[in-house]
């Protein structure tokens, strides 16, 4: 199981990112239903696409989630509590609620994380010495 953050989804949708788009699209297609998209990530992706003038891309992504391309899951109360606890502890990190929910859901499901947001996912930790299990490293992601 892999919990997905917004960045890889946006790259998979945005052909303008060229090599990064191909990398993300191929990776997400290959992983299919192993990928869990938290509801906050679906909402953030929709808002980003629409705010940047791509409402049709937002609709297509929403429809793909409705047909089960990836697994759409809601955070539970324990996920929200952990996300809020991390958000309070790392208030100055810049991590937003969708990031924190991805972390919490991955922790509770013992899942890997797919993100491009390495700064936030490295600065927010459960405890000293903890590292989130990231599916890809910065070095693996092509420059757009």
Residue locations for each model-derived region?
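Short, well-structured N-terminal submotif of metal-dependent ribonuclease cores
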Residues: 1-37, 50-63, 128, 140-144
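Short beta-strand scaffold positions
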Residues: 4, 36-37, 74, 97, ...
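Short active-site oxyanion
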Residues: 31-35, 69-71, 108-112
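Alpha-helix capping/helix-boundary segments
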Residues: 41, 79, 101-102, 119-121
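Amphipathic alpha-helical segments within well-ordered protein domains
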Residues: 43-46, 84
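Acidic catalytic patch
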Residues: 69-90
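Acidic, PIN/NYN-like endoribonuclease modules and their adjacent C-terminal/linker elements
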Residues: 72, 103, 109-144
